[in-house]
């Protein structure tokens, strides 16, 4: 007999990562309402993380301090790693989830598509030709580092494509919003397959 959704354990996690370069704590509730408490020291990055919370309906608390006197690379990458670990821990055995999710999100002239698979196999394919190298104090190249860190530790396959865009802020925002929407879709429970692992292998 399938397990009612109400009896599924809370999908929450808290992960701390401390290195010589960064100190990061991430708390997630995959069945939240989109609340966020974010402090990474990089304003635009906080703005993008807020998109993940709001559009993914994930409660997200991220507190990070890093060697920003050098640049944002270690902070952004390590937040991706820690968030990936937290999501992997919170999602558990993946029973009953839809597994796959995709979303298209526009913002004015920009349009991005994100497709995700909770496959258990880390893989990132990202094609985002940013029109500017910097977005505020955020190095646009670090978007790739964030998603690579997430993918490697959430054990997901992720395809990200910016299909149109002339403004780098708009490009990034559509990418993060589409990621959030795809994540939300993949993590939703399928009422017709509760208690089942969504794979013919019987494991993910």
Curated annotation (Swiss-Prot):
Catalytic activity: D-erythro-1-(imidazol-4-yl)glycerol 3-phosphate = 3-(imidazol-4-yl)-2-oxopropyl phosphate + H2O
GO CC annotations on file: cytoplasm
GO biological process entries: L-histidine biosynthetic process
Keyword Cytoplasm assigned: yes
Gene3D superfamilies tied to this protein: Imidazole glycerol phosphate dehydratase, domain 1
Gene Ontology molecular function: any one: imidazoleglycerol-phosphate dehydratase activity
Broadest EC class assigned to this enzyme: lyase
A Pfam cross-reference name: IGPD
Annotated disulfide bonds: none
Pathway: Amino-acid biosynthesis; L-histidine biosynthesis; L-histidine from 5-phospho-alpha-D-ribose 1-diphosphate: step 6/9
Places the protein is found: Cytoplasm
InterPro entries per the UniProt record, alphabetical: IGPD_sf (IPR038494), ImidazoleglycerolP_deHydtase (IPR000807), ImidazoleglycerP_deHydtase_CS (IPR020565), Ribosomal_Su5_D2-typ_SF (IPR020568)
EC number: 4.2.1.19
UniProt keyword annotations, A-Z: Amino-acid biosynthesis, Cytoplasm, Histidine biosynthesis, Lyase
NCBIfam families: PRK00951.1-1, PRK00951.1-5, PRK00951.2-1, PRK00951.2-4
Classification via HAMAP family: HisB
Sequence similarity: Belongs to the imidazoleglycerol-phosphate dehydratase family.
Protein name, entry field: Imidazoleglycerol-phosphate dehydratase
Organism: Albidiferax ferrireducens (strain ATCC BAA-621 / DSM 15236 / T118)
